Amino acid sequence: MTYCNKSNQTSYPFILPDLPYEKESFKPHFTLETFDYHHGKHHNTYVQNLNNLLKDKEELQKKDLEEIIEWSSQNSNAAIFNNAAQIWNHTFFWHSIKPQGGGKPSGKILEQINKDFGSFEEFCEQFKQEAVGQFGSGWAWLIYHDNRLQIIKTANAGTPIAHGMKPLLACDVWEHAYYIDYRNKRPDYVDIFIKHMINWKFVEDNLIK
């Protein structure tokens, strides 16, 4: 795995990765029901779908998840790409958050944020605008590209690794990520994500790799 080795699974058949924390530890920001649906049902469905799509494709079965994403992107195989990318994106997202996370970071990541955005407050404002502004399902990302931090959004299963970009942080803005707890209030969810969930150590580890 180029960025988050926890997101990489070596080969077919793929399995649903465990969460890196107890589901209960995110109360009151996420309920158990959200994790049961988001991880246990949505994420798991992508895993099952990908395995079914690969069951008769022996050459693809030899590839790891990133290689499958690359192959399916280059060969315009939407079904395989969507499920493989969503497995990768979700696993990366689970590591992008942690209990009692969020707030203002320190160290190299804060230095880089101040350099590229002017201030942490400006970064927060821009990240929230991108996440809330993504029309329909998708993702908001902090990436390192062209020697600087950038905030981008991708629709549906879109992922930075399909375009040679280095992701540092992912925020899932599909409705299934927040609707149980926040209903249609995506801005509230993104605000909580920034203030109470971001795993800044994970972000910095990805930056310095």
UniProtKB/Swiss-Prot annotation:
Q: How is the cofactor bound?
A: Binds 1 Mn(2+) or Fe(3+) ion per subunit.
| Coiled-coil ranges (or none) | none
* Listed PROSITE patterns: SOD_MN
**Which InterPro entries does the record associate with it?**
Mn/Fe_SOD, Mn/Fe_SOD_BS, Mn/Fe_SOD_C, Mn/Fe_SOD_N, Mn/Fe_SOD_N_sf, SOD_C_sf
**A Gene Ontology molecular function term of the record:** superoxide dismutase activity
**Which keywords are on file for this protein?**
Iron, Manganese, Metal-binding, Oxidoreductase
Highest taxon of the lineage: Bacteria
Q: Which cofactor does it need?
A: Mn(2+); Fe(3+)
Record: residues binding Mn(2+): H38, H90, D172, H176
Q: What does this protein do?
A: Destroys superoxide anion radicals which are normally produced within the cells and which are toxic to biological systems. Catalyzes the dismutation of superoxide anion radicals into O2 and H2O2 by successive reduction and oxidation of the transition metal ion at the active site.
Catalysis performed (reactions): 2 superoxide + 2 H(+) = H2O2 + O2
Q: Per its UniProt record, what Pfam families does this chain match? A: Sod_Fe_C (PF02777), Sod_Fe_N (PF00081)
> PANTHER family of this UniProt entry?
SUPEROXIDE DISMUTASE, SUPEROXIDE DISMUTASE [FE] 2, CHLOROPLASTIC
Record-stated family: Belongs to the iron/manganese superoxide dismutase family.
Spell out where the chain crosses the membrane. none
The entry's protein name is Superoxide dismutase [Mn/Fe]
Q: What is its EC number?
A: 1.15.1.1
| Residue numbers binding Fe(3+) | H38, H90, D172, H176
- Family annotation (Gene3D superfamilies): Fe,Mn superoxide dismutase (SOD) domain (1.10.287.990), Iron/manganese superoxide dismutase, C-terminal domain (3.55.40.20)
